[in-house]
Amino acid sequence: MSVGIVEEQSVTFETDLRLESGRILGPITLAYETYGRLNADRSNAILVAHAWTGNAHLAGKYSEDDPKPGWWDAIVGPGRLLDTDRWFVICSNVIGSCYGSTGPASVNPKTGKRYNLSFPVITVRDMVRAQALLLDHLGIERLLTVLGGSMGGMQALEWATQFPDRVRSAIALATTSRPSPQAISLNAVARWAIFNDPSWKKGEYRKNPKDGLALARGIGHITFLSDESMWQKFGRRYSARDGLFDFFGQFEVERYLTYNGYNFVDRFDTNSFLYLAKALDLYDVAWGYESLEDAFSRVTAPIQFFAFTSDWLYPPYQTEEMATTLRALGKEAEYHLIPSAYGHDAFLLEHETFAPMVRDFLARVERG
């Protein structure tokens, strides 16, 4: 059952947040949504962390005529994987984004103008520290679990390492301890597309740049899919509207990338895209530690990992390495490799496959 009609909330923290870069950001506004009810001892809270261009709208609709529900609606609600009859589910928009939380598109209170490129570089660790402020605001000392895929999985890892006393468990899907040179290079090409769009104006645009961001998003969509899923979804089908020997004729996969690229321009800020891409590239759970082992030595909660066979952005071996490292340290870690043709996006689509394992894991966590 769906959670039904929901409402976005926000909170502004007047206290400054010291970032990993050493710079200070404040005040900070966080947009968030909650589903279900917090129990009397505040022990039933689950935090869901979104991916790169996600938002706090995890589930439900804002109105009856809303065309589609939140981005992971299928797993949230009464009787669903994240059962809102039992648990209090929270999702917040990360700092640096453009869906209600403080980011480069926000107005700098010191200047009265948009931050744009004066916004400080942020990290995934900074995002999690901001989320900790939200939990303090909600009166939640400890989470039952923190769950996320891709960049959301990175946030789950940061919670487990940076705030081990505040999480009873963590669930990380389709993620990595640090992006590979290949992943960084793909983001670099996406950045070039934006930097070389004259309408970007070095971040000082009034109207969201169109062509550069659309191309950057198209590159992203390629990384989210897989060879197998592209064959299944598009094959080598040519657009029926174009002549085969029309120079500007397009294959169906080209139309897909064009449509999704330009559609994205209408809903996401270009500078936010760049800042979050930078945060992804900089991510290393062992940052500030001597090694991955040193970072994971801080973990006290069990962690459940999921990787997907066709994910070439964050390949399974990267996930397995984390689980193996934790086990070698005597920590509790599960690793599940899910067969899937959906590529990196599988974490959003294969919920029926991994749901039984997550249910079993959370039941064990609750039993202690």
UniProtKB/Swiss-Prot annotation:
Pathway annotation: Amino-acid biosynthesis; L-methionine biosynthesis via de novo pathway; O-acetyl-L-homoserine from L-homoserine: step 1/1
One Pfam short name: Abhydrolase_1
GO biological process: methionine biosynthetic process
Active-site positions on this chain: 150 (nucleophile), 311, 344
InterPro entries: AB_hydrolase_1, AB_hydrolase_fold, HAT_MetX-like
Single GO molecular function: homoserine O-acetyltransferase activity
EC number: 2.3.1.31
AB hydrolase-1 domain mapped to chain residues: 44-350
Subcellular location as annotated: Cytoplasm
Keywords: Acyltransferase, Amino-acid biosynthesis, Cytoplasm, Methionine biosynthesis, Transferase
Keyword Zinc: no
Positions of substrate binding: 217, 345
GO cellular component terms, A-Z: cytoplasm
Family named by the database record: Belongs to the AB hydrolase superfamily. MetX family.
Subunit comment: Homodimer.
Record's function text: Transfers an acetyl group from acetyl-CoA to L-homoserine, forming acetyl-L-homoserine.
PANTHER family in UniProt: HOMOSERINE O-ACETYLTRANSFERASE
Protein name listed in UniProt: Homoserine O-acetyltransferase
